[in-house]
Amino acid sequence: MTAQPPFGQAPLPAHLALRIALAARSLKGVDTAHLLRALIAAVGEPITEARLRKLRASRLRTRLLETCGEGVQSTLTDRQLHSALGLLKGRGVRMPEDPLPIPEPYRNGEFQDSVRIACASDNGERLDGIFSNCTRFLIYQISPRESRLIDLREPGPCREDEDRHARRAELLADCQLLYTLSIGGPAAAKVVRAGVHPVRLARARPAREIVEELQRVLATAPPPWLAKAMGAEPDQRIRFTQ
C-alpha cells in the first residue's frame, strides 16, 4: 500500500512515503494506513522530515496504541519500534534515484594545504546520517582550490564484544573533521580521542554544499586548529587569526 495522506490533503514527498511504507512493514500488526494516522497524531500535519526527526519512540508507541487498539500491544516490541523509528528518520533508506557517488583515486600529499573530512550519510551523496548508526561515511579531501571524494567507508555490523563508537572513530582516524546530524557525548569523546573534530549540523544537506563552504573557509581565514591540520606554519596560523 502506498503511504499517502487522506483524500484532499497534499501528497507526501516520495522519500517520506517510502520511509513510512518500510516502517509499517517492520511493525507486526500495523499496516501503512494505521501508521500514517498515528504519525499525523504524533507530529501533526504536514508530515515533514524535520518533524519525523524529532519524533521519540515513546510518543510513537502511544499514538500507535491509540490508533490500532490494545491488540497491537502484545505484538509491538521495543526492537520493532526502534527499527521503525530509524526507518522513519531515513536511516538505511535509499531512494532508487540516489545512486552512490563514485570515489576518485587520491595520493597522499597530492593536494597542498588540504584537510580530510568525513560526512555521515545514509542516502547517495547527502550528509543525512547520525554518527552512531549511519550506513557509510563519505570521505573528501579538500584544499582551498580543489576537492575530491576519495572513499566510501561502511562500518558494517559489530561483534557483540566490540565498542561500536570506538570502531567507527578508528575508521575515521585519518580525517580531521567529522560532519554528522547528531553525536552523543561518549561517542564524541571517542572521535576526539582519534584526532577528529566533530561538527554537528541541524539538518540534512547535500555533502557537496558542506565541501564548498569549507573550501571558502580554507581559502580565507581558517581557525588556528584547522590551519594546523592543513599543515600551516605557526606564523601563517597567526596571520589567519588577524
Swiss-Prot record:
UniProt-listed CDD domains: NifX
Ordered alphabetically, the record's keywords are: Nitrogen fixation
Q: Name one Pfam family in it.
A: Nitro_FeMo-Co
GO terms for biological process, alphabetical: nitrogen fixation
Which family is annotated?
Belongs to the NifX/NifY family.
Output this protein's name. Protein NifY
Q: Which species does this protein come from?
A: Azotobacter vinelandii
- Gene behind this protein: nifY
